[in-house]
Amino acid sequence: MNMEDAARGIELVRKQKPLVHNMTNNVVTNFTANGLLALGASPVMAYAREEAADMAKIAGALVLNIGTLSRESVEAMIIAGKSANEHGVPVIFDPVGAGATPFRTESAQAIMRKVKVSAVRGNAAEIANTLGEDWLIKGVDAGEESGDRTELAKKAAKLWDTAVIITGAEDVITDGTKTYTVGNGHQLLTKVTGTGCLFTSVIGAFCAVEKDVCRAAVSAAAFYGTAAELAAAKTESRGPGSFQIEFLNQLAAVEAMDIKERGRIREVE
């Protein structure tokens, strides 16, 4: 995948303005909606099980996020996911905090069993625990890493037959056959709640306009990381509050040329 391909994703999103159905958590709903609007997508936040299936079938992508889960919300997500599957809508799953509690882990695993997911995005601990492997987790954040993230991503992608995105200082993205790392981003992303969840929804927007899910995820990661770098360059001395606002500005401002110039994408074996 070359830089030209990676840069094309944001142009397609802005041209097509895909509807992204987010069943996300109540900590990040506003930030996620604003982020998607900034980059050019059309977000909808619909959680009720009574309309979950109907909304999912008309969306360009469905994003499931268990950050503030309940039994009822998981049931609604599964209903929406099955509807998306029936209508050819890509499903992006964020198993937030999988491994932190048995209920959270079991819920993540239930969604993976009952819904055909196109891509899973999480930190190494979340992916490992959803897979059924032990990996240290602290709250909903990854603990000290003790394994090979690339091999973990490949294993998960092959077992689930889906694209896997493991985020960190360097993102690992694989469909089990092709594997990439994306080195764009900034540590200030870790100081603003919801940036990981928004990234999952951004992947959803890119998957809505690009059928190759792995390609879409790489393109989304390069775009998202570039926006973070440019926002940090303008606000780093002022802290995370200023960064958060400027990051939304950069999601709207980053162009394909910025990604071509700054993108750090590498294919690995």
Curated annotation (Swiss-Prot):
Q: Specify which residues bind ATP according to the UniProt entry for this protein.
A: 121, 167
Database matches in Gene3D superfamilies = 3.40.1190.20
Metabolic or biological pathway, per its Swiss-Prot or TrEMBL entry? Cofactor biosynthesis; thiamine diphosphate biosynthesis; 4-methyl-5-(2-phosphoethyl)-thiazole from 5-(2-hydroxyethyl)-4-methylthiazole: step 1/1
Provide the Gene Ontology terms for cellular component: cytosol
Q: Which GO terms fall under biological process for this protein?
A: thiamine biosynthetic process; thiamine diphosphate biosynthetic process
Q: Which family does it belong to?
A: Belongs to the Thz kinase family.
Question: Could you tell me which PANTHER family the record lists for this protein?
Answer: HYDROXYMETHYLPYRIMIDINE_PHOSPHOMETHYLPYRIMIDINE KINASE THI20-RELATED (PTHR20858:SF17), PHOSPHOMETHYLPYRIMIDINE KINASE (PTHR20858)
Q: What is this protein called?
A: Hydroxyethylthiazole kinase
From which organism does this entry originate? Bacillus licheniformis (strain ATCC 14580 / DSM 13 / JCM 2505 / CCUG 7422 / NBRC 12200 / NCIMB 9375 / NCTC 10341 / NRRL NRS-1264 / Gibson 46)
Organism lineage: Bacteria, Bacillati, Bacillota, Bacilli, Bacillales
